[in-house]
């Protein structure tokens, strides 16, 4: 039990240190959205709370081809908050190919990975050209249709920010943990 108590103390101190780092920092939070209005609306509360943890914050949203009201939602967000930047466009492309001739899961196909990389380059353009890289200290990329985020987890990461340049979330695929999907 002594070790557990020491761990809890270390964890609390690290979260507190993260809060201090965040409160002195400028952040850009980047999201890509398509046909996820319901989940995105739920996560906007978290994103708003996360933004308040920083001295300054920007929210960059890249939206494409939504037909469920997501496009209209993100456009209204930009209209009401000068710290929100929206890049919305239509490609007419399918989200995922139905089936690959090679048998590869379409979620991990070259087609989808290339498309997602191009979309991510769009928010990098917004960061570089519209916001300015000198105006931010950190970039957080969030998948806004994830079921739940941990604010303490993010604070904990910032509490150790002297040890890292990049932090990546641990996700789970439908195929199980530690399954090589590529």
List each language-model region with its residue ranges:
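Catalytic phosphate/metal-binding cores of nucleic-acid and nucleotide-processing enzymes, i.e., regions
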Residues: 35-43, 77, 144, 158-162
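Short aromatic/hydrophobic "clamp" motif used to bind/position activated sugar donors
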Residues: 139
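Short beta-strand/loop segment that forms part of the nucleotide-sugar
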Residues: 55-65, 87-91
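Alpha-helical elements of Rossmann-like donor-binding domains used by nucleotide-donor carbohydrate transfer enzymes
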Residues: 42, 46, 73, 118, ...
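Active-site-proximal specificity loops/subdomain of glycosyltransferases
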Residues: 69, 73-136
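Preference for well-ordered, secondary-structure-rich cores of eukaryotic proteins
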Residues: 28, 33, 42-51, 58-60, ...
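N-proximal low-complexity "stem/linker" segments adjacent to membrane-targeting elements
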Residues: 1-49
